[in-house]
């Protein structure tokens, strides 16, 4: 374990908890899903997110939460209580904030499951997400899958849109823009032959991860028919921080794809930006139709 990871329990209790966890979670490793969740001062949103995972109809799961140096007493209280109450939950505490990619990697290191899934601490899953998506992956024999998701405005407390995933997502498509919602993604370590970790970028680390996986498995299949997750948004409009993503996009092109500075800038300006704008336009149209259907 990295020296920055501090488990805030006495060593004796921690050893007991780990042994008890192994004994109590009688799961087939071939079916086990390790759910990766980073959190940082998530407060009141955290409890709903955790509940949406632990209440899944799919029984074989473990939830690995890495607290990325939270200072919020509400967040820490929720984590301590849920870890003591449910043996499927394992919490790693970091002594200061490192970023979501680093936090996810600490959980991935601890993961025991064949499948690795992701959910952030303010997002939610539908109750049957894992049951449906794992069955879909087995049917398709695919190593990477995702799904569509609903966009929920926390300020207004209502669904305001939908992001519809393409049926198939290739490496070539992903070079233009991230088309996989991290909160819906699952990858199969057995088919891929290993675990994959996120680059420790402050942003766009999920896109970088999926590019790495698609280099090997070639295609990601999207679950059809219905959304399987809820992305919780706290603002109506796109954050101004989106502008700062330019440097992280270029960093992904350079570090993951090995492009030089000029080629990375070219891809960003002439491939990413046009694709990103078209994606936003499509999402707006899909969301309008979704909200209108809901009445």
Q: Which role fits each region the language model picked out?
A:
Residues 109, 164-248:
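Conserved nucleotide-sugar donor-binding catalytic segment
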Residues 116:
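Short aromatic/hydrophobic "clamp" motif used to bind/position activated sugar donors
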Residues 128-159:
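Conserved donor NDP-sugar-binding/catalytic core segment of glycosyltransferases
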Residues 94-111:
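Glycine-rich, basic loop-to-helix element that forms the pyrophosphate-binding segment
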Residues 42-55:
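Short, well-formed alpha-helical segments that are part of the catalytic scaffolds
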Residues 31-33, 54-65, 86-90:
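Short loop->beta transition adjacent to catalytic acidic/histidine clusters or analogous donor-positioning motifs
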Residues 67-77, 96, 120:
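A conserved acidic beta->alpha catalytic loop
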Residues 120-124, 148:
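The conserved acidic donor/metal-binding loop of glycosyltransferases
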């Amino acid at each position: 374990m990295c020296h920055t990871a501090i488990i805030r329990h006495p060593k004796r209790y921690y050893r007991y908890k780990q042994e008890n966890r192994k004994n109590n979670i009688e799961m087939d490793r071939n079916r086990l899903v390790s759910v990766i969740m980073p959190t940082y001062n998530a407060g009141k949103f955290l409890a709903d997110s955790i509940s949406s995972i632990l209440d899944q109809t799919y029984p074989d799961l473990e939830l690995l939460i890495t607290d990325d140096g939270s200072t919020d007493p509400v967040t820490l209280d929720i984590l301590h209580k849920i870890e003591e109450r449910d043996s499927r939950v394992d919490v790693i505490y970091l002594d200061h904030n490192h970023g979501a990619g680093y936090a996810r990697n600490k959980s991935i290191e601890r993961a025991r499951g064949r499948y690795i899934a992701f959910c952030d601490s303010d997002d939610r899953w539908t109750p049957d997400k894992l049951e449906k998506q794992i069955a879909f992956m087995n049917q398709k024999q695919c190593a990477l899958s995702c799904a569509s998701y609903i966009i929920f405005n926390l300020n207004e407390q209502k669904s305001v849109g939908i992001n519809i995933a393409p049926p198939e997502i290739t490496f070539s498509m992903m070079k233009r823009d991230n088309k996989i919602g991290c909160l819906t993604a699952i990858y199969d370590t057995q088919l891929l032959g290993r675990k994959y970790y996120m680059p420790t970028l402050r942003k766009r680390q999920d896109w970088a991860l999926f590019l790495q996986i698609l280099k090997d498995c070639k295609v990601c299949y999207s679950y059809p028919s219905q959304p399987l997750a809820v992305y919780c948004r706290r603002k109506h409009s796109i954050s101004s921080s989106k502008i700062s993503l330019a440097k992280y996009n270029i960093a992904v092109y350079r570090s993951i794809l090995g492009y030089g500075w000029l080629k990375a800038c070219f891809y960003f300006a002439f491939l990413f930006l046009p694709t990103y704008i078209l994606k936003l336009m499509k999402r707006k149209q899909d969301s309008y139709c979704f909200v209108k259907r809901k009445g």
